Amino acid sequence: MAEVTEKVILPKFDKEKYFKDGEIVYGKREEVEEAADKVCADGFKNIVLLGIGGTEFELAPIEYQVKKYSDIDISAYNAADANTVHPKNITKDTVVVTASASGDTVEVVEATEWIVETGAQVIAFTKKEGKLGKFLTEKGKIVIEADVTTGGCEFSYVLFNFLAFKIMNNKGAFPKYKEFADGMKGVFQNLYDIRVQFDARAEEAAKKYYNAPYSIFCGSGAAWGETSLCVS
């Protein structure tokens, strides 16, 4: 077995950029909550989560948590699959939640084009000047943009949680939402601290298993989406 000589260390992580992006994301809280309030005031019968690739898996915890802690009708679709079958539960009484980091994810753009024709409300986390953002804005749908580039999935998780949990709160299913959302203000410092604390263990595991014939990722519940993403 070849000796491991390269060491990827935490100082390569751009801490200041990470914290700055975290502030931007948290600063979107009010805008996201307003979107939640609007769809609740307008009324809806079900929520559909729509994504492909990483977005599909990032939305998975929301489906799990909403199903576990509320009686809201929620389902999730791979955008390519949805474009094939046009699910009948997407109607004028549906709230569709989607996202596109690039702003022009082909399958998501295609899906929203026929979804808006059903009269469904759409909330998209994407670039306002991207193809998806421009289209949905023209159609009077909700577009929320957070211009961040570091941190992986966790920025998306915070935004998705604000939306889903505020909707649950409005429906009487999450009475401590404000306490939760206030507490999220320090989450990025906590996540950075976890990185620091885990760095040595991660290096040890990498040295021990980097050349293993195969790896098994274990997860369930709210963690299953991210576990699947690791494998995919």
Language model features: what each stretch is:
Residues 40-186, 220:
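Glycine-rich phosphate-binding loops that contact phosphosugars or nucleotide phosphates
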Residues 8-45, 143-152, 159, 164-232:
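Active-site phosphate/pyrophosphate-binding segments
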